């Protein structure tokens, strides 16, 4: 696999450096989960499935605080949907989940391979969700990684610089509407620095998009230069507050998809009630325009998320989204119970049958309407 060159190249550089190895560490762990989901609105009302993520992690400590480590994990899953015992549909897959090698010191790290890259100040509705698709309702917080090389340098004043090169990630990531041209690498970076009582950052990413799979022949291009700029800041005052924004511009006319503008404003606060009630409020505006910042017919969402620990091993939380354009509310509630190495999740929801939450349209096929899901997770 060509993507393994990222890992092999980094490993060769490290082991040819002549450093004496001080200590080795090998760790195996895994996560096994199973769920049962019932929603009478679906074509297949009853869904059941299982997933196993085995992970191996090797650490090779070197002198002077240097570390070389490798992580490899896989994602094995299967699902079956049932209308009746005689009418079912199923799917499953085995694929790499993470596969990277990293060289790090006290202030620097270089990581190559299949990895998760995410950043930003927003909590749930994230304009800077450029390379992942984390779902806030997912107890496992799973997301596919990207193939690439990431370098980070940390200054003593808590400022840091990120630089990355991605390659071989042709499927849409995050907020992307169009695939990436697989033959052209993507590049970008981020500068994060202290600001007042918090921190702020500026991010940039460049890729070459490929729109040849679109149905409109006039919008089909093999190579479309795309520039993406992001800004985020978070401050701890009486309440925690943040702003996060992203602007994406296509170098060719893609009609209403030529420009994309997304902005999030949010606050959080923990009330001194009982064991502590944490509340998050976010406001999101997203627009697609032929002209930059025209903001014609933007989608506007409000979100409130509350979490309350019922005890040492129980937690109750809910999320409410409100779609102002369609005047629709999405309601999720989740109870979590910890049993040593086992965790039980019970989730219920009441949603519109037309599911329009940004970046959750695929999940909408399952979570549209009213339903309940049970999930059991075993970590070893």
Where are these regions (language model features)?
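Transmembrane beta-strand segments of Gram-negative outer membrane beta-barrel proteins
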Residues: 23-41, 72, 159
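Repeated loop/turn-to-beta-strand initiation elements of outer-membrane beta-barrel proteins
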Residues: 26, 64-70, 107-110, 158-161, ...
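Transmembrane beta-strands of outer-membrane beta-barrel pores
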Residues: 34-40, 60, 74-80, 105-107, ...
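Residues that define the transmembrane beta-barrel architecture of outer-membrane proteins
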Residues: 46-54, 92-97, 143-147, 183-187, ...
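Residues on the lipid-exposed face of transmembrane beta-strands in outer-membrane beta-barrel proteins
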Residues: 54-60, 98-103, 149-153, 189-193, ...
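Outer membrane beta-barrel
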Residues: 61-161, 166, 193, 353
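Detector for outer-membrane/organellar transmembrane beta-barrel domains
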Residues: 195-197, 234-323
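Outer-membrane beta-barrel "beta-signal"
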Residues: 342-343, 349-350, 366-380
């Amino acid at each position: 696999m060509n993507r393994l060159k990222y890992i092999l190249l980094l490993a060769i550089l490290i082991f040819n450096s002549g450093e004496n190895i001080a200590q080795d560490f090998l760790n195996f762990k895994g996560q096994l989960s199973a769920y049962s989901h019932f929603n009478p609105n679906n074509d297949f009302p009853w869904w059941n499935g299982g997933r196993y993520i085995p992970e191996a992690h090797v650490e090779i400590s070197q002198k002077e605080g240097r570390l070389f480590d490798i992580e490899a994990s896989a994602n094995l899953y299967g699902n079956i949907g049932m209308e009746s015992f005689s009418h079912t549909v199923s799917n499953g897959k085995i694929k790499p989940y993470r596969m990277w090698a990293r060289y790090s010191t006290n202030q620097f790290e270089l990581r190559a391979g299949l990895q998760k890259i995410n950043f930003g100040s927003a909590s749930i509705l994230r304009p800077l969700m450029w390379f992942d698709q984390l779902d806030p309702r997912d107890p496992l917080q799973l997301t596919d990684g990207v193939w690439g090389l990431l370098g980070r340098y940390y200054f003593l004043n808590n400022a840091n610089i990120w630089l990355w090169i991605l390659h071989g990630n042709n499927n849409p990531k995050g907020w992307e509407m169009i695939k990436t041209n697989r033959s052209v690498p993507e590049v970008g970076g981020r500068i994060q620095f202290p600001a007042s009582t918090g921190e702020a950052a500026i991010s940039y990413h460049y890729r070459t998009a490929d729109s040849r799979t679109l149905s409109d022949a006039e919008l089909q291009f093999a190579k479309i230069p795309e520039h993406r700029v992001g800004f985020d800041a978070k401050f701890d005052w009486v309440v925690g507050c943040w702003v996060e924004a992203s602007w994406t511009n296509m170098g060719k006319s893609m009609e209403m998809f030529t420009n994309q503008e997304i902005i999030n404003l949010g606050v959080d606060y923990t009330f001194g009630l009982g064991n502590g009630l944490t509340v998050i409020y976010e406001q999101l505006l997203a627009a697609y325009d032929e002209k930059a910042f025209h903001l014609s017919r933007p989608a506007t969402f409000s979100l409130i998320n509350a979490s309350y620990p019922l005890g040492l091993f129980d937690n109750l939380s809910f999320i409410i989204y409100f779609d102002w354009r369609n005047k629709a509310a999405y309601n999720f509630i989740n109870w979590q119970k910890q049993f040593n190495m086992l965790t039980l999740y019970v989730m219920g929801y009441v949603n519109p049958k037309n599911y329009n939450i940004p970046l959750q349209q695929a999940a909408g096929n399952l979570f549209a309407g009213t339903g309940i899901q049970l999930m059991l997770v075993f970590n070893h």
